[in-house]
Amino acid sequence: MTERVPPRRPATFKLSDPSVVLIDSDDGGGSYTAKPSAKADARPAASAAGAAPPPPPPRARVELAREAEPPISAPKAPKSVINPKKGFRWGTVFWSAATGLVSLAFWLWISKLVEDLFAQSQTLGTIGMVLALLAGGSLAIIIGREAFGLIRLARIEQLHARAARVLETDNSAEARAIIRELLKFEHPNPQLAHGRATLQKHIDDIIDGADLIRLAERELMAQLDLEAKVLISKAAQRVSLVTAISPKALIDVLFVAIAATRLIGQLARLYGGRPGALGMFKLMRQTVSHLAITGGIALSDSVMQSVLGHGLASRLSAKLGEGVVNGMLTARLGLAAMDLTRPLPFDALPRPQLGDLVKDLMKKREKDE
């Protein structure tokens, strides 16, 4: 019977070992040994008189397989799973036609009134015509201001979305276009003169697009963010105080609504927006939608710790508790409005947290007590 050869046991070795043979598959199977290490060079060379010892058998053979790199191709845009077809909007047609009919009816009524006044007296007709012209001119100015406010709000939304894309794509040309438009947008604000000068000096430098957006955020938004935080904190404190001392629930609801509307308008004007009545309605709707998306007034651990850490959980009355909750709701509304009215997204600067505002609210409450 032939003797069974035991299997080779696994062993470890280094590729720098001179006894390891490396085989390159691209060279047609040609083999070469690794270069000896420093320790191998330190070995004494064989004497010239003696015969050279036979080379030891290789400990291992390693084949180097080189895989071909796949060609790099630009990624294709994913096809939209849902491709809604824009149909004819009958609702828009209805409201446009209804508005036109109401406008014509109002115009006919005004013209009929002026004709009747002229029939009664020349003086009354003249006064009626002047009043009608004043009313029409005032209405045109109001409509123009509303349209101007909506346009500025739309520009803020576009700047915010474009800056967010630049932070992802690092497009320098788009970043410079955004900065130039932002400088024109914030030009009326004298508080940002130093930041505008700094950006004008660095706008043509060799800077990545994302870094340029971050520079603009630090130079233009830092001071505005501090003022916005003060506005939100003061509004939350006022709501908390009035809710705690008001005798009627209806007064609480009205004051919270008025304070929230006023706060949103102040934040919009702080960041460069000039919303009118329609603009405020749009901002209120967007703020409520933003709150619904982000989870409403969800309290984090830091917020709960700030509330419980002041010992209020055991000694808060019902009205005082309502005041604190309404104050936190106002602060949450302010933070949501801050996200919507800010021309640049938060990236280089820290986003204000609800916990910090709640801590300020608790400190104010302790002073009042």
UniProtKB/Swiss-Prot annotation:
It comes from the Bacteria. The chain crosses the membrane at residues 90-110, 124-144, 239-259. It is found in: Cell inner membrane. Residues 1-61 are annotated as: Disordered. Its main location: membrane. It is a multi-pass membrane protein. Pfam families: DUF697. Keywords: Cell inner membrane, Cell membrane, Membrane, Transmembrane, Transmembrane helix. Disulfide bonds: none annotated. GO terms for cellular component: plasma membrane. Coiled coil: none annotated. Residues 34-51 have a biased composition (Low complexity). Belongs to the UPF0283 family. PANTHER family: UPF0283 MEMBRANE PROTEIN YCJF. This is UPF0283 membrane protein RPA1583. It comes from Rhodopseudomonas palustris (strain ATCC BAA-98 / CGA009).
